[in-house]
Curated annotation (Swiss-Prot):
GO molecular function: ATP binding; CTP synthase activity; glutaminase activity; identical protein binding; metal ion binding
Note, other: CTPSs have evolved a hybrid strategy for distinguishing between UTP and CTP. The overlapping regions of the product feedback inhibitory and substrate sites recognize a common feature in both compounds, the triphosphate moiety. To differentiate isosteric substrate and product pyrimidine rings, an additional pocket far from the expected kinase/ligase catalytic site, specifically recognizes the cytosine and ribose portions of the product inhibitor.
Alphabetical list of NCBIfam families matching this protein: PRK05380.1, PyrG
Catalytic activity: UTP + L-glutamine + ATP + H2O = CTP + L-glutamate + ADP + phosphate + 2 H(+); L-glutamine + H2O = L-glutamate + NH4(+); UTP + NH4(+) + ATP = CTP + ADP + phosphate + 2 H(+)
Active site, per annotation: C378, H513, E515
Lineage: Bacteria, Pseudomonadati, Campylobacterota, Epsilonproteobacteria, Campylobacterales
Homology family: Belongs to the CTP synthase family.
Protein name per the record: CTP synthase
Listed SUPFAM superfamilies: Class I glutamine amidotransferase-like, P-loop containing nucleoside triphosphate hydrolases
Binding site for ATP: S16, L17, G18, K19, G20, I21, D73
Residues where Mg(2+) binds: D73, E141
Length: 538
């Protein structure tokens, strides 16, 4: 931790300004200067983690290799940095409070009255310092907006850290909005000025202003922001909208963000090597080919519920010089006659609950019968089994016990027991608590030779991430296999991890979530081959 330098990223004016992408972009530039870099996300909500939140409330829950259910921004960090992060890279107010109360019960505070300062702020600082071990830079993204009461003690902890570490170890980057008033054709700086005033009132002074704007800022406006916010003129970085989030590091580099960073930290001029990155971004922005993927989901009112999967399709497309167009198909209102017109492949993602499953099953049947390339992920694979049992084996009552515990043919059922990542036996019932009780994180999968899965991964054993309570019932396996639906992947305890359909160009189901390990620089192999198959269809 001694050598680590800290870049704190806060947000002002309103939420969803792109602090996560901004943090990822800064980290990417520093990483490409051969520094050891990581990112930490602080979430101010009181939930322990987002695991039980509705996807429509929070967006995607991203699962790390060590089984943590985290904020979707952790997915951005991994995809930009091309490395695995852990549960140490995300914490919530719920976790902070829980730790402080647990310590109080153990008597670790020696009878003191427990207060926000110093006990809560000390726990925040401890976690930040712990995440910085072995690094040159730790970027810390503070969720929420300056002025929110939920974030007050985080800003206090940042203020204290700057005093403890010194100015030469800390930079505060404030992401803010420069709104454009169309009627007067003006860009307005007043919200930024007020946001910075509020931040400074709380004891945190920004050294860099990252101004989100729909239009470029002229020199006069940048100078105005610099003067009113008390930063150097070259420390006002304009972040206009880009055609791809992966173009943001290039934009920040062109805007000169590394100049104030190097100056503050007493570093020589920074020269990131971005040629390979630039090539991939160019293929995203101006690809040679196109495919259309029918994406059959039910959380379509907030597409960030599927963020990692959307990005994984983009990664595969970049490596194939292909624009992947998504045809969003609502599984609750699925029209089998018209919804799949013109699609080159069908994707059925993971999900929870009974709502919309019949539409997904209908789409899977179309993919099977019409030999459209198909990829089913988690619930998507489970429903492929249900569809096959109903329509090929004639088991009309086939279902998952997630939807009907008394179904006639429980071809998908609750994982009663399994070995977790620590080789501890876990036992689950239908009455088990929901939070943190799924099969979570990275597990090994043995692949059958001569399968599409082996062709994609090019090795007999892989590790992929999981997030599920239900599994395929092996009782019916022989019946499926006799009809051409083969099991091609096995996990611990012989859990069925992957299936493929014979005499079909590409019909694959996987229990794991391949999207969680896809990165711009290294797309996930099975998703890459899925897009290849769609390309051959188009």
């Amino acid at each position: 931790m001694d050598r680590a330098k800290f870049i704190f990223v806060t947000g002002g004016v309103l939420s969803s300004l792109g602090k996560g992408i901004s943090s990822s972009s800064i980290a990417t530039l520093l990483q490409h200067c051969n520094y050891q870099v990581s990112i930490l996300k602080i979430d101010p909500y009181i939930n322990i983690d987002p695991g039980t939140m509705s996807p429509l409330e929070h967006g995607e829950v991203f699962v790390t290799s060590d089984g943590a259910e985290t904020d979707l921004d952790i997915g951005h960090y991994e995809r930009f940095l091309n490395r695995n992060l852990t549960r140490l890279n995300n914490f919530t107010t719920g976790q902070i409070f829980s730790s402080v109360i647990e310590n109080e019960r153990k008597g670790e505070y020696l009878g003191k009255t427990i207060q926000i300062v110093p006990h809560v702020t000390d726990e925040i600082k401890r976690r930040i310092k712990s995440a910085a071990k072995g690094l040159d830079f730790l970027i810390v993204e503070v969720g929420g907006t300056v002025g929110d009461m939920e974030g007050m003690f985080y800003l206090e902890a940042i203020r204290q850290l700057k005093l403890e570490l010194g100015n030469e170890k800390v930079i505060n980057v404030h992401v803010t909005l420069i709104p454009y008033i169309q009627t007067t054709n003006e860009l307005k700086t007043k919200p930024t000025q007020h946001s910075v005033q509020e931040l400074r009132r709380l004891g945190v002074t920004p050294q860099i202003i990252l101004a989100r704007s729909p239009k470029p800022l002229d020199k006069e406006l940048k100078n105005k922001i610099a003067l009113s916010c008390d930063v150097e003129q070259d420390s006002v970085i304009v972040a206009t909208d880009t055609k791809s989030i992966y173009a943001c590091p290039i934009l920040f580099l062109q805007e000169g963000i590394l100049t104030p960073i190097a100056r503050r930290f007493n570093l020589n001029k920074l020269h990131p090597k971005m040629a390979a990155w630039n090539t991939l971004v160019e293929k995203i922005i101006a690809p040679k080919h196109k495919v259309k993927i029918g994406f059959v989901g039910k959380y379509l009112s907030l597409k960030e519920s599927y963020k990692s999967l959307i990005e994984a399709l983009i990664h595969a497309g970049a490596h194939l010089d292909t624009q992947v167009n998504i045809e969003w198909l609502d599984s609750e209102n699925f029209n089998e006659k018209t919804d799949l017109e013109g699609v080159d492949a069908i994707l059925v993602p993971g999900g929870f609950g009974e709502r919309g499953i019949e539409g997904k099953i209908c789409a899977i049947q179309r993919a099977r019968l019409e030999k459209l390339p198909f990829l089913g992920i988690c619930l998507g694979m489970q429903l492929a089994i249900v569809e096959f049992c109903r329509n090929v084996l004639g088991l009309k009552g086939a279902n998952s016990t997630e939807f009907n515990q008394r179904c006639e043919y429980p071809v998908v059922y609750l994982i009663g027991d399994f070995m977790d990542q620590n080789h501890q036996k876990q036992v689950r019932t239908y009455n088990s608590p929901l939070g943190g009780t799924m099969r979570l994180g990275e597990y090994e999968c043995e692949i059958m030779p001569n399968s599409l899965l082996e062709k994609a991964y090019k090795k007999p054993s892989i590790k992929e991430r999981h997030r599920h309570r239900y599994e395929i019932n092996p009782k019916y396996r022989q019946e499926w296999e006799n009809k051409g639906l083969k099991v091609v992947g096995f996990g611990s305890n012989h859990l069925i991890e992957a299936i493929e359909l014979e005499d079909h160009p590409f019909f694959v189901g996987v229990q794991f979530h391949p999207e969680f390990t896809s990165r711009l620089q290294s797309p996930n192999p099975i998703i890459l081959d899925f897009i290849k198959s769609a390309l051959s269809k188009s």
